[in-house]
Amino acid sequence: MEISVASVTISVVLAVVSWWIWRTLQWVWFKPKMLEHYLRRQGLAGTPYTPLVGDLKKNFTMLSEARSKPLKLTDDISPRVVPYPLQMFKTYGRTYFTWFGPIPTITIMDPEQIKEVFNKVYDFQKPHTFPLATIIAKGLANYDGDKWAKHRRIINPAFHIEKIKNMVPAFHQSCREVVGEWDQLVSDKGSSCEVDVWPGLVSMTADVISRTAFGSSYKEGQRIFELQAELAQLIIQAFRKAFIPGYSYLPTKSNRRMKAAAREIQVILRGIVNKRLRAREAGEAPSDDLLGILLESNLRQTEGNGMSTEDLMEECKLFYFAGQETTSVLLVWTMVLLSQHQDWQARAREEVKQVFGDKEPDAEGLNQLKVMTMILYEVLRLYPPVTQLTRAIHKELKLGDLTLPGGVQISLPILLVQHDIELWGNDAAEFNPDRFKDGLSKATKSQVSFFPFAWGPRICIGQNFALLEAKMAMALILRRFSFEISPSYVHAPYTVITIHPQFGAQLIMHKL
């Protein structure tokens, strides 16, 4: 009896170990090699598979080397920001595959194929290969299928253009405060001085999202912004170890810190949402900020079709992060580029004077700023907030003339596409807002070659919000100052989820 029990136990253990070894080999070797063979058979070129790590190590080595050297102001930023994808593009052409660990990732640069990926939202879904990436915020940007459709339907009213116009006074108040601080700094030095505008722009855009989303000030939401900024840095560091199975669950110092920061954000937001819900019940809650509009839209849903409190908090986290991050980087690169191109700075300032005169900027006037719109589009083309978007395929499907197997990912390289001379001409790396003088459709030849906010059904819901806020900020800045590059400025764009200035943005501000 004892022998038979021991034998059974050993057999079970061996079976479990064998099954685990087989699953591991399947994941680390057999499936990747099968997918690689499938792709190469169709004529797709790409890198050979390195077990487990794929191309991650090579990618990060090249990125570290690129970041060690700053750029000239006139340089294309691609070699510093996306050196590995750029090298792959030069080596393999416009469609190729690389490896995110054991997962093949097919990069496509053909506008028709990009359009197809954006349009087929149920076939090309958000990947979930790096769970830590959602610790900052899940929300609408990370959902798929019916959940994405439901959240989009509920959130849409908050970003209706008429609702956003009502938020313009809040834009004005937040922007005016930071411009006033810069004015004081310059006045204290005489009529001009060096200002690192990056911290001020971060503070300004954070204050805007606090006021417009939650009816509060930056100081009340400051802790959330601090924690999300810390999380962004930790996630970028953790990304280097993404190929280690189960890494996100290991109790490392950085993982523990990420989870603690995420819990603290959750507690703060739960307090904000619960306080607003109690105020609504008492008939005292404002309904003109994003949270108020969102709650109202959610309540209008039929029983069971609304969002849970947890869902609401995830959307609030996304409001905080995306709402602040996208506009702050758009503004900092706009100021850097206008410092370099004084002719466009003068044209933008003249337009602001013509439209507003001595009046304060309002929604109607901001929408008349054609030159400013051209400038912002060109900044978004050269410095898109994120450098690429990724989609996952879970079943075999066609993309153009390719047949793609389930289990691969698609990379849409925003930066490379928007800098591509084949799509944008020989001056693709140069700052030339005139390319947008006849509108987006003419500039892109009606192709999907400009997608800083994504495209199609999943286009960024906050696009109009970000652009109107940026116009308000630039209108106030241009009326008060002229500005140029400081000798101490180091041109070093780098990615912390979005493209940041690595060493700040030091400009010489002249009071007008």
Swiss-Prot record:
Residues spanning the membrane: 2-22
Database matches in Gene3D superfamilies: Cytochrome P450
Major subcellular site: membrane
One GO molecular-function entry: heme binding
Keyword Phosphoprotein: no
The organism's place on the tree of life at top rank: Eukaryota
Cofactor: heme
Top EC class of this enzyme: oxidoreductase
Keyword Membrane: yes
Family the entry assigns: Belongs to the cytochrome P450 family.
Protein name listed in UniProt: Cytochrome P450 72A15
Source organism per UniProt: Arabidopsis thaliana (Mouse-ear cress)
